[in-house]
Structures are given as structure tokens and as C-alpha cells.
Amino acid sequence: MKKHKIGIYEKALPKNITWQERLSLAKACGFEFIEMSIDESNDRLSRLNWTKSERIALHQSIIQSGITIPSMCLSAHRRFPFGSKDKKIRQKSFEIMEKAIDLSVNLGIRTIQLAGYDVYYEKQDEETIKYFQEGIEFAVTLAASAQVTLAVEIMDTPFMSSISRWKKWDTIINSPWFTVYPDIGNLSAWNNNIEEELTLGIDKISAIHLKDTYPVTETSKGQFRDVPFGQGCVDFVHFFSLLKKLNYRGAFLIEMWTEKNEEPLLEIIQARKWIVQQMEKAGLLC
């Protein structure tokens, strides 16, 4: 068994293909798992209403391919956030959470990544933060009962821009089912002290997103996606060296949005090769 598994985000693979094809392509490209996306689009939200036969079909494809789907990126809460002042939207956010946990149980998904936004399209204030806390408490109660882990991603907005900021919520929620899902690109873009941040959260890190970013500065808002590996602000060798020092044993997920590109498979193969090279330089072999 490999020490560290490397997976690929669903949105890096061609979009209009079957799940059986998606799993087979991920395997052919050298990945061990896929992270499923349940985003704010109606198309991907509809997966929460899959029939029993549709769920069984995907489960069989997982077993046949040997490629698992251990995690779900639940970014649908950007459109339907826990912190919304609209009661109907909050009710929808709870419904999405319930259905996401149910789907996870059926498919063997063990970790649901939550977006660290109280609201995204609304203005934040004390009320939205209060509603966000109520939503997280509700979600963790359900997840714990189903033995599904919830992991909050370090985000592209100040609200959850560091593990330090997440740690406040960890203290409030106080549950082993509430963890953190660092995105090394986002963590770096906010000019955090990477060693201090990783050390603070190492005992609650469920998995790690790998991507490059451009930093936030006094004159720039930064860039949080679609930055080619090696061209941004992330010091990957230093990052992997720190994880080796901290004895991190979890998985890595390469996060890319190449599903509509002309040669997405070539891009993800090259990305994986580059990441492995950085790991080898740091002595963190896969």
C-alpha cells in the first residue's frame, strides 16, 4: 500500500462522460481516487436525488474499477448557504446537507468537504455568522450519527482563510467529526505562516488540496484557481517537507478545473508528475 494516495478532482476530468468512464480514466492517469463535486449547478445538485438503482450502478463501478470516491466537495452551499438571512435558503441548505450525507453513506464517501463561507452572494454580518454556526452544528450532528466526517476547506475569502480561523470553530463545535481540509494554494495566497498553520491543525486534517495560486497583496486580490503548478506562490517542496516532519499520513487531492479544456487528461497527467517530483525532492514519497 502506498504511503500517500493522490486523487483527482472530478472537475479536472472530461465533463460529459459516464462515471464508469471517469473512474477508468482516473485510474489510467495514475490516480487512486476521485473527489466528487456537488456544486451549485442544477446538474450536479440533481445527484442528491439519484435513485437507488443509480446509486447501486455507481457503487458497482467503484468496485469494478478499484478507484474509490472517498470524498465529496459540497460547494452547493455557496448558492444555498447556512448563513443566509432568507429562511427558505437556510432550509434548502439543511436539506442539501441531509441528502449529501445520505448519498455519502450509500456510495462509501467518508469525508464531505464544506465550503468555509457563512454567505457568499450576501453581505456578511453577525446574523449571518450566527446562522452559519447553527447550520454547522446541525450538519455535524447528522454527520456524526452517520459516521461521515465533515471537513471545512480553507477558502479564498477572509472568513476562513487560515487554519487558525478554522480552529475557532473547532473549539465551538468540539467534535471528532468536524475537521479541516487545507487547500495549500489558498493557505499560501493569504500569506499565512505555513509551518505554524499546519502544526496547529495537523491532528484534525482530513486531506489536503493541492493547487498553485498567486498571492493577495496590497495591490492585488490574488488568484485562487487556474494557476499552473510551479508558477504561483506555493513552495511545494517546503510544504511537503513540513508534512514529512509533522508525520502527515493522509491523502492528497490535485484540484484542477480542466473539464472543458481540449486536452484535460494530458494536463492532469503532467500535474501529477510534477507534484510527485516535488514530493520526491522533499523526501515525502508516494
From Swiss-Prot:
Q: Return the Gene3D superfamilies for the record.
A: Divalent-metal-dependent TIM barrel enzymes
**Which keywords does this Swiss-Prot/TrEMBL entry list?**
Isomerase
Q: Give the EC number(s) under which this enzyme is classified.
A: 5.1.3.22
Any one Pfam family here would be: AP_endonuc_2
Q: Tell me the Gene Ontology biological-process terms attached to this UniProt entry.
A: DNA repair; L-ascorbic acid metabolic process
Fetch the PANTHER family from UniProt. ISOMERASE (PTHR43489), L-RIBULOSE-5-PHOSPHATE 3-EPIMERASE SGBU-RELATED (PTHR43489:SF1)
Function of the molecule = Catalyzes the isomerization of L-xylulose-5-phosphate to L-ribulose-5-phosphate.
Tell me what else is known: Probably part of a sugar metabolic pathway along with SgbH.
This chain belongs to the protein called Putative L-ribulose-5-phosphate 3-epimerase SgbU
Q: Which organism does this record belong to?
A: Haemophilus influenzae (strain ATCC 51907 / DSM 11121 / KW20 / Rd)
* Encoding gene, per UniProt annotation: sgbU
